[in-house]
């Protein structure tokens, strides 16, 4: 089946579709971070990620194999899916992998921040860049305005979350700046891997280094 054969729901404009998808992304990632923060231990979270991830990936495979199932799913989720996802694997697959990695390797505060960097900072950068982006970052399709918005939001989030966990001490403002910069650089980087994969992992590593050595 060709991509052009699939009739996904349409909105009034491509920009509106993009914003809806980003807001959905933001709400889901924020919910995941909240649930991990409030209700789950590392071990419980890893078990849940493995279980849900396996079910989701199997469902995605069946969706791509059976056109009728794919059409039914598109009627519900078509508005929040990227065009290339209509006939290929969902972008949730690399996110599930990244989520498992950051939860397994890092402490809860760092893992939560990695999720929020992707779930809040990335959509903010995208939406601001879409409507206000005029200056392109060198060597990328990303805008300076989106980068700056991501940096500001990610820095503030880092300060709030780390302060809540009593981390950072006197170096907290500097660590927050480094965390925000790391997240925004990861989002703006021209890496060929999916943002859902490299943004959480790279930003978690940078935040861990900052907390360890500052």
Predicted region positions:
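Interhelical loop and helix-boundary elements at the membrane-water interface
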Residues: 2-47, 61-157, 161, 170-213
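Alpha-helical transmembrane segments
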Residues: 44-56
């Amino acid at each position: 089946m060709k991509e052009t054969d699939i009739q996904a729901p349409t909105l009034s404009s491509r920009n509106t579709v993009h914003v809806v998808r980003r807001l959905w992304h933001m709400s889901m990632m924020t919910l995941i971070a909240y649930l991990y923060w409030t209700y789950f231990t590392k071990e419980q979270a890893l078990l849940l990620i493995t279980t849900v991830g396996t079910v989701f990936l199997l469902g995605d495979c069946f969706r791509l194999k059976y056109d009728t199932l794919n059409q039914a799913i598109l009627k519900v989720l078509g508005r929040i899916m990227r065009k290339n996802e209509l006939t290929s694997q969902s972008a949730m697959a690399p996110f599930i992998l990244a989520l498992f990695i950051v939860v397994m390797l890092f402490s809860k505060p760092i893992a939560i921040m990695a999720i929020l960097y992707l779930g809040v900072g990335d959509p903010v950068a995208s939406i601001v860049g879409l409507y206000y982006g005029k200056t392109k970052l060198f060597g990328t399709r990303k805008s300076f305005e989106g980068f700056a918005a991501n940096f500001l939001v990610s820095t503030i989030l880092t300060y709030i979350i780390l302060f809540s966990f009593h981390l950072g001490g006197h170096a907290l403002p500097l660590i927050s700046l480094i965390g925000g910069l790391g997240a925004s650089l990861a989002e703006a980087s021209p890496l060929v891997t999916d943002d859902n994969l490299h943004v959480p992992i790279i930003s978690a590593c940078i935040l861990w280094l900052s907390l360890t050595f500052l």
